[in-house]
Amino acid sequence: PSTQQPYQTTMHGIHDWFDHYNAALFENKLPNFDDIKIKRIHGALGQVVYTTYKTREQKFVLEMLPRYETKKMFLETLVHEMIHLYQMKIKNDTGNHNKLFFGFRKKLNFLGLRLSR
């Protein structure tokens, strides 16, 4: 699909692009999300939801919209959420939009993607 046409989110697309950007940005060190949901989200383009159970086990769930204005918007959102997963799961960071998060900006620019809040 063209990067300027509306993009329909699919599990297959999420998994394929996750693998692509995991190799390009994280040297294949980023673990998969524990679960993925395609759903309507109010006030966000995507999000990582994490829960901690009594066992102190953490679960990281990726939530993506069913449809994006463009494929590029889908890709930027997916990579944005992958960076949050990296912060929390690999670096034990807060997952906020901080220096670690924005440290990926140059890499994304090189790949033709924008990194924003």
Language-model segments: residues:
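Active-site-proximal or metal-binding-adjacent scaffold patches in catalytic folds
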Residues: 1-76, 85-117
